[in-house]
Amino acid sequence: PNGEKLGTYGVIKGASSFIGATVADTEFGLEALGYEFENLILYATYIGLGTVWLAATFSRGSFASAMKISEDELFPAISPVGYPIGKKSLKESVMRKIMKSDQRKPWDKLFFNNNFSTPLTEKESGIYLAPLEMLRLAPSATNAQPWRILKVKDIIHFYVSHNSNTRDEEKLIKRVDLGIGISHFHQVALEHGLSGDFKKLSQENIQVPENTKYIISWVTKDK
C-alpha cells in the first residue's frame, strides 16, 4: 500500500512497504499473532531490514480496507519494512525517551518464585536465566511490559497484567505483547537446548493478583 495514503506512522517517513497480520478472535489468537509476528520481525532484523512494531499509531481503517480484512478478524499491529538510515533522528530519540523504550522493569517486578509474594532472583531462575532476561528485554506497546511470570519448580506460568482502568482495546494489545515476550523466551530457550511444551494448566492452587490473567505455561521436558 501507498504510505502517504495510509496515514502517519510515528517516526517512519516515506514508508511504502508494510507487513501486517490478522487473526480470528480465539482463546490464544492474539498471543499466537504476537509470537509469530515477532519471529518474522526478528528474522527481518537478522537479514538487515528495518522494522517498527506499530500497535496503536496507525490508521486501522485504511489498512483494513487495503488488506481486505473482514469484520470478524482482529487486526492489532503492522510494521513498515525497509532499510534503516542508521542514526536515530532527534524526533525518534525524543519519542523513545517519552515511551521509555530504552528502559525495562527490574526482575523483582516481573518474575516470581512459587507465589506472587516472592520475587524470583536471577540465581533462582537456574537454566531459565537467559530466556527470562530476553523476555524482560522484549518490546511492548508504550514499554508497558504486561507479562508476569511465576516459576514453580520446572514450570513457567505466563500471565498478562493491566491496570484496573485499562480499556478493552488496550487489553487486546497487551495479549499481543505477551506473545512477543513468549517468542523471545522460547527462541532463547531453544538456543540453549531447553525443551518443553506450552500447556494450559490449572491455577486452582495459585493465588493470582487482581487485574492479572493467566494465559499459558511452559512445562520443562525431562531429558
List PLM regions with ranges:
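Acidic, surface-exposed loops and disordered segments
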Residues: 1-223
